[in-house]
Amino acid sequence: XSGKVLSEEEKAAANVYIKKME
């Protein structure tokens, strides 16, 4: 992102990161 809207790729990356933190 550019800081405006999260792309699908960025959403997926964030989802993976969150799952790793659990």
Swiss-Prot record:
It is found in: Mitochondrion inner membrane. GO terms for cellular component: mitochondrial inner membrane. It catalyses: a ubiquinone + NADH + 5 H(+)(in) = a ubiquinol + NAD(+) + 4 H(+)(out). Keywords: Membrane, Mitochondrion, Mitochondrion inner membrane, NAD, Oxidoreductase, Translocase, Ubiquinone. It is a peripheral membrane protein. One of its GO terms (molecular function) is NADH dehydrogenase (ubiquinone) activity. Its EC number is 7.1.1.2. Transfer of electrons from NADH to the respiratory chain. The immediate electron acceptor for the enzyme is believed to be ubiquinone. Complex I is composed of about 45 different subunits. This is NADH-ubiquinone oxidoreductase 16 kDa subunit.
